[in-house]
Structures are given as structure tokens and as C-alpha cells.
Amino acid sequence: MVEELGEGVTGLAIGDEVCALLSGGGYAERVVVPAGQVVAIPSGTSLLAAGAVPETFATVWSNVFMLAGLQPGETLLVHGGASGIGTTAIQLAKAFGAKVVTTVGSADKAEVVRELGADVVVNYREDDFVEACREVGGADVVLDIIGGRYLARNVAALARGGRIVVIGMQGGVKGELNLGALLGRQGTISATSLRFRPAEEKAEIMAQLVEHVWPLVEAGTVAPILHRSLPLEQVADAHRILEESSHVGKVVLDLGA
């Protein structure tokens, strides 16, 4: 909720229910944010649910749609399909007419992502996502949170002209790549971090979310997936949930609890 406005800020009013894309420091009761990174929450969305929206939706929109340019009819491979990023990517890709291949680590998570619309679900502990992608003609876009360990396999999974966007390094910071394989697929690899983008880029991302994605949220076509909410004083418990990797969607700190 807006408590104060800086000089010259327009389009917002004290008392407005908003969500914001932060550069960090979100474990707080009050934050100061550039006005361009603050937007009204989608109609019908609770403040608690809205807390799960900015980081994940901005990450997916900026990388999958703005950078990689996913088109209707193309195939998206998203790793970690049951994560906050993954559940958002699946829903948005399907809403805009794309096919989705995703990886998960358990049968329970596989069931959830299928319900969200994933077309092909791969349990990475048992099956090969490269083969799964090849069976559907290859991935046009890969959204990768793993990094080094998956680099070569992501290239192998590409369709001709495919685009890989690396946004995480859970599988290491280094990977070996046969450039011939990338050349043969006429593929591209990008690596981005939302946190370190300049304020004007973040403002543009948030503006596009309001224009293109908020109507989908308000219509119930896509929604933030909340695994659990905890009060701020239980932040250590929230991190333990994430470390155990048993969650589906986002874990949110509830400052009103």
C-alpha cells in the first residue's frame, strides 16, 4: 500500500494497493521504490497473492517474451516447472498459444504442472528432456534456471533457430559447449539478471505486465501459485522450505500475519 509519494510522481495515490519490482530488501515492512517499478495490483487479487507476482511474472515476461520472443505455436522448454518461475512460465506460455515441455523432480509435481497446462512433462530423475524435446520438433525457447550442468543438453534440445535464456546457476557456473552444435541449430544463448537491470528497463517490463498480463490475471486465465505463506519472523522456516525443494510455486512472507 502506498504511504508516501516522491516529488513529481503521478499515476499513484496514497492508499493505493500496489505491488513492486524490488532490487532487493524485500524482507521489510516498508520499502522505497522507483515509481516506474510500482503498479496497481490486478483487480480481484489479494495483497498476499500480489506479493508473489512481480519478481516471477517480470522474470518470465522479460525473458521468454521480450528477449526470446516466444510466438504462438512455438515450443517452450522450462526447467523447474513446479517452481514459482516455472508455474508462471507454463501458464503464460499456454495463454499466448505456445506448447510447453517442462522438467520436474517428482510424480506429485508432474501432476501439478499438467494441471497448469504443460503439454510434455519430464521427470528429470528418470527420463531425458532432450529426447522429449526432439520428439516434438525441438524447443524454440529454453528458460533455464540450472546453468552450467545443462548447457550442452539445452543446445541439444533446441529446434533450428532456438533461443536459450539462462537466468540461474543452480547447476553450476561453468559448462562445456560444442559450438558446432549451436551453429548447426543456428541457436542463440543469452544470460540475464532482472535484479541488475537499470530502472528504466524495469519500468518498461512492469508497464508491459500491466498491459499484456494483468488482463489475464483479472480474467483468471493465469494466477500466482502460492505454496505457503509465513509471518516475517519465520523467514528461516521459509528458506528451509525452499532448500528442501518440496514446494510448488511461491513461498510468501505475510507482513500482516
Write out the residue ranges for each language-model feature.
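Short helix-loop-beta connector
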Residues: 13, 43-46, 69-75, 137
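A structural motif shared across PLP-dependent enzymes of the aminotransferase-like
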Residues: 22-35
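Glycine-rich phosphate-binding loop and adjacent beta-alpha segment
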Residues: 104, 149-222, 254-257
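Mid-domain Rossmann-like dinucleotide-binding core that forms the NAD(H)/NADP(H) cofactor-binding site
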Residues: 51-126
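C-terminal capping/lid region of NAD(P)-dependent oxidoreductase domains
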Residues: 214, 219-228, 236-257
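NAD(P)H cofactor-binding loop motif with strongest signal on the N-terminal glycine-rich segment
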Residues: 81, 146, 169
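Glycine-rich beta-strand-centered segment in the early N-terminal region that forms part
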Residues: 1-25
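Short amphipathic alpha-helix with an adjacent loop that forms part of the alpha/beta core around
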Residues: 128-137
